[in-house]
Structure formats: C-alpha cells, structure tokens
Amino acid sequence: MAITDTINVAIVGASGVTGGSIVNGLLALTGLTVKITALTRPESLNKPANIQLKERGVQVVAANLRGPLEKLVDLLSSIDVVISAIYWGSLDDEIPLANAAKAAGVKRFVQSAYNIPAAARGVTHLRDKKEVILSHIQQLRLPYTYIDVGWWYHVVLPRVASGRTEHALPFGMPDLPIALDGNIPSGLTHIRDIGRYIARIILDPRTVNKKVFVYNELYTQNQLCDLVERLTGEMPQRRYISEKCVQSWLQEALDELERNPSSDIALGVVSLREVFLASNVHGTNTPEYAKYLGYLDGKELYPDFTFLTYEDYVEEVLDGMHSQTVA
C-alpha cells in the first residue's frame, strides 16, 4: 500500500502490551493523518484501558470476531490496514477476521506474529498455528505482512542477587539457563520499538506479501550476562546446559501440555522452551537465517531507524524504570 495523506488502521488487542506499542507507533507518525479504530470485545468496551485509548483519539468499537460476518465486514469497510495483536490463546479468531478483511477490501492484513524467525512447521506449537492462519490468508489472496521481532528485551534480562532487575522481568518468569557455551547470537527488540517498526512497515510497499524480521541488536547469552555484570557489579547466575538437557526440559513441558491440552499456561511454557531451543541451540533468531527463510531484513529496509539499545535499557532498569509486564 502506497503512502497517502490519511490511513485508516484497525487494531485487535490495542489495549494489550503489544497493541499499546502499536498504537504509540502509529500516533507518532508524521506527515500523514492516522485514524485508529480499536476492535474490542463488547464486554470490554468500557474497561479503563479502552477509555484511555478513547482519550488519545482512538475510536473504540465493540466487535465479536465470532459473530455474523456481515457485521464485521461493515466495521472494516473503511479500513486500509488491519493489525492483530490478539491474545495468543485466541489466535483462531484471526480466521474470521481475515475473512471479513478480504470481503471489506482491506489493503493489508498483519496477523499476530511478533516472535523469532522460524521454519513454517515443527518449530513451535504457536508458530504452527500462526502458519495455518497465514496459509488461510494466502488462500484468500488477502494482502498481508508477517512480522517477527526476535526476543523481547525484558524476557532475556538476567537476574542478579540484589534483585535490582526483578521489577522489569515478566510476571512468573523462570530463570533461564544458558544453552551450550552461551555464544549463539540472538535478535532482541524492546517492546516500545515494536510498534514503531510496524508503523514503518505498513506504509512500505516493499513489504506487501512478505515476511519481515526486525530487531534492535544481536546479543549472545554470555554477552547479556557480561553487560549486566559490568553495569551492576554483580555476577548473574550462569547455569549452562547441553542440548540434551534443553530437549529434556522441553519434553517436561510437552508432557504437561499433553496432560492439560486446554491449559494456556501449559502452552505458554511449551512455547517459551521451544523458542529457547530454536534460538539458543539451533541459532534461528538471526538475520542470516531469516534471510535464508525469505524474510526481508529490517536493518536494510530502515537503516535510519533509531532504537533503545540493550545497554541503555539495562541502565533504565537499574534506575527503576520498565515495570513488570507479560512475556
């Protein structure tokens, strides 16, 4: 989609962490008018987060993604771009959303991806589900962009004994081991930069019907620990484990998911460990591998993009910033 004077964007999940970053990124765009419509569940219409969106000029409307297709098509009739930041337990709702977007003539559909680059099947349970949705989008011939962002900064933040980084870690985040020798690089992105990347991507005709990998910096697990040790004077725990141990660690989570197949918590644990294996053992979370898979490289697309460095992020954490959020 070419840049025009006005762009109408609908977001599913605008009140969440990722959705909030996307809203911020869109509202920060200059040189054009951005009209944002947040699609929310009817029962959530008057929740504080949605009221705050309204106060920022976002139109918040009730939408039942599992309701009559005609009503959803009507809501999207004036929309140029649909962006999903839907809760990962509700990914299947993107199927009717895509159907409505196609019928409404939406010019670009961005599904909820925002993870590490990976092969189409067999890497993570959530990736498999997202690829099914992407296949459906492609069968519709609905223009799309698939965006991956690597690990989020706060998910890989090392702990220290004093607890100075604890407030910035996701709720319930376990201590992550270090895979192999800890020297495999991995792409990292701060949550507030994700929305800014997406705002650039949806205005870029080069990214239509493409996968895009954006990231801020590459770090190994050892480099993350070295950085935190240098800035805090404390040595993070380094628990090195073999590939066999990572596989066993993952299998424990898979067994729990098999016992509780409807548990979002069990699926979340499996997903975290699958991503850990893929990125920190198999080395898939890199621009080189992403290019091999056919992704466009955000560094090449947007060489002028400024971002929060990981070192500056850690400094801000040590100053008490970046409160806990979900992973």
Curated annotation (Swiss-Prot):
GO terms for molecular function: oxidoreductase activity. Its main location: membrane. NADP(+) binds at residues 13-19, 47. The chain crosses the membrane at residues 9-29. It is an enzyme of class 1 (oxidoreductase). Disruption phenotype: Completely abolishes the production of novofumigatonin and asnovolin A, but accumulates asnovolin I and asnovolin K. Keywords: Membrane, NADP, Oxidoreductase, Transmembrane, Transmembrane helix. GO terms for cellular component: membrane. It is a single-pass membrane protein. Its EC number is 1.3.99.-. The active site is at 130 (proton acceptor). Pfam families: NmrA. The keyword NADP applies. GO terms for biological process: novofumigatonin biosynthetic process. It is found in: Membrane. Pathway: Secondary metabolite biosynthesis; terpenoid biosynthesis. Coiled coil: none annotated. It catalyses: asnovolin K + AH2 = asnovolin A + A; chermesin D methyl ester + AH2 = asnovolin J + A. Belongs to the NmrA-type oxidoreductase family. Asnovolin J 5',6'-dehydrogenase; part of the gene cluster that mediates the biosynthesis of novofumigatonin, a heavily oxygenated meroterpenoid containing a unique orthoester moiety. The first step of the pathway is the synthesis of 3,5-dimethylorsellinic acid (DMOA) by the polyketide synthase nvfA via condensation of one acetyl-CoA starter unit with 3 malonyl-CoA units and 2 methylations. DMOA is then converted to farnesyl-DMOA by the farnesyltransferase nvfB. This is Asnovolin J 5',6'-dehydrogenase nvfM.
